[in-house]
From Swiss-Prot:
Name this polypeptide is given: Aspartate beta-hydroxylase domain-containing protein 1
Record field: transmembrane: 46-68
Organism: Mus musculus
Family membership: Belongs to the aspartyl/asparaginyl beta-hydroxylase family.
Keywords annotated in UniProt: Dioxygenase, Membrane, Oxidoreductase, Signal-anchor, Transmembrane, Transmembrane helix
Amino acid sequence: MWKGGNQEAVIEGSGGELGVPGSWGLQDAACHLARASLPIMFPWPLPLGSSALTMLLGALTSLFLWYCYRLGSQDMQALGTGSRAGGVSGMPDVCSQTGPRGLGDSGEGPRAEGLVSRRLRAYARRYSWAGMGRVRRAAQGGSGLTGGAGVMGIQRPGLLFLPDLPSSPFVPRDAQRHDVELLQSSFPAILRDFGAVSWDFSGTTPLPRGWSPPLAPGCYQLLLYQAGRCQPSNCRRCPGAYRALRGLRSFMSANTFGNAGFSVLLPGARLEGRCGPTNARVRCHLGLKIPPGCELVVGGEPQCWAEGHCLLVDDSFLHTVAHNGSPEDGPRVVFIVDLWHPNVAGAERQALDFVFAPDP
C-alpha cells in the first residue's frame, strides 16, 4: 500500500480498480504522473501486466533523466552568465597592494568565490571528487581564494592558494628537469626568434606588431600564450620558441594562469614588489640577454639570471625586478614560461584547467 497525502492507492493483483472514492489504482497514479511531469505522453490507461510495469518503469526513468538534464542545463547557463559577468577570461588578479602585473597578467579573473565553487561542482558532476581535497578547500575559501587566511607575509597569491604545497621563492631545476633541459637546449633557436621580432625599444607609438603595451616604463613583452590562449600570429613569427613550448610536459597552457613569451627590461627600469595570482604555478625564466646590474628578488632572496640557463621562481611570493645597468649595457631579455608546480597532481591540474578555463 502506497500513501500519498490523505489518499491511498490500493494495488490490486489484476484488476487495478479504484477501491474507494479518493483512492488511486496503479493505472491512475501512473497516468497522473505522466500528465504532470513527462515531456513525452503515453496512451493511458494501460492494461496491467508485465508490459505495463515495464512501461511505468520506463516512464519513471525518463522523468529522472529529464530532471537531470534540466538541472545540468540550468547550472551550466548560470556558470556561463557568471563567467561573462565576473571576467573569468584572462589572468586572475594579483595582490591588491602590489605594483604592476607580471608577464601576461591581465588583472581579470573570477570576482567571487561562489563562481569558482560552482564551476568545481560542475566538474565533479562530470568527472569525480576523487583527489580534489586541496582544490575543494581552496575553492571554499578556507585557505584558498584571494590569498585566504593563513597565507601571511611575503607569500600572498592574488587569487588561488592551493594548501599544503611545498613552497620556496626559488624552485630547484631538478623539479622540472625535462622542461628545463628542453628549454636550455632550445636557447639558440629562441634567441634567434627574439632577434627576428626585436626593435630598438625607444617608446615608439604605435608599438611594433605583436608587442604589448608596457607594464611599466621600460618594460615590454611579446606573448606567444596569454592567459591560456595561444597568440597565433606571434607563434608563427617565433617558430623555434613555439616548437619548444609544444614539447614541454608541464606547460600551463590550458587555463588563465598560463603565459609564455619574451620579457624585456630596459636599463634603469624597475618593477616594484608584487605577487602572482597562484602558488599552483612555477615561472621558468630562460636568460637570453643578461647585462650587468640586473637583479630578481623573490621572498627577500636575490638572484640573477644567466644566459642560456633557466631559473624557476614561485612568483606567488613578493618579488621585484630591476635593471640597474647603464644605457650602454642594453636591455635584459628573458623568455618566461608558466609551468605547473611539480606537486600539483594530475587530477588537480585537470580540475583547475576546467575551473579556470579561458572563455572561448
